[in-house]
Amino acid sequence: MSNTIFDDVFRTMIEKMPYLAVPLINEVFHTSYPQDVPIVQLRNEHQQENGEIITDSCLKIAGKLYHIECQSVDDTTMAIRMIEYDFYIAIENAQKQGRRYRIDFPKSCVLYLRSGNNTPDFLEIEMVLPDENIVHYQVPTIKLETYTRDSIFEKNLLMLLPFYIMRYEKDIHEMNENPEMFQNLLNEYDEVRTNLEKGLSGTDKAVLYMNLNKLIIKIADYICQNEEKVRKGIGEIMGGKVLELESERLERLRKEAEAEAKEKGEKIGKEIGEKIGKEIGKEI
């Protein structure tokens, strides 16, 4: 299965900014991990006879395995895919206890960027073991459309922001033609930018702010590729103001100090020159 832009953006966040997954894990599994909890990123390539399968993410937090898949469509085979992924993850992390093996399935969930009335809250499989015991395999789903701008920031689910435009996907063309709808969308994104600035105003978070901005614009450009007005409007709001990095701030202050010192030096030099000139004039 080929990657989509949504896969690429999601995996970029998981690989480069894995701490963004922590609030999402807390939301789904009702945990309370702090944002700075140590995270171990496990490999997401698993070999099988007819090639390799690639999962979107596999993280280890506090000794537990977490697996998150990002879906841009409501795939009815997703339950089978998930148990296949989870089985490979469990096997690769199997624990040998004498002649017995223990495999722990990861806590998994699926993030649906697009969903409908038939998208389930849980993916389910009923497994019948050789001894006739029945095991119920259940994976919770997260639906982007159920999260508003306010709830995203309240729960710190910043990982959802790049995909936020997809909540309005069906209305993009109309927004391009309707000034009022278009302005409402711009106001919405102005609030997103403002909230991001407030939450990531520290110099240590400036890089995260800029990276999220880039990903927000990347997905918006893709979704709005045929609607130039909307695409440009979001780009100007999100890309129009970039927080200053600490290194940039120090460089700016250095240049300002040098310019000020030069100006003062020139002024003092001029005053001294004038004074010397007057003294010479008196002697003559």
Annotate each language-model stretch with its function.
Residues F153-E180:
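Coupling/switch segment of ABC-type P-loop NTPase heads
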Residues D86, A90-N93, E169, A220-C224, ...:
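Short amphipathic alpha-helical signal-transduction/dimerization elements
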Residues R11, R43, R81, R99-R102, ...:
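Arginine residue identity/basic-tract feature
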Residues K60-S72, H173-I284:
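Short, charged alpha-helical interaction segments and adjacent helix-coil junctions
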Residues M1-M159:
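Accessory alpha/beta interaction modules
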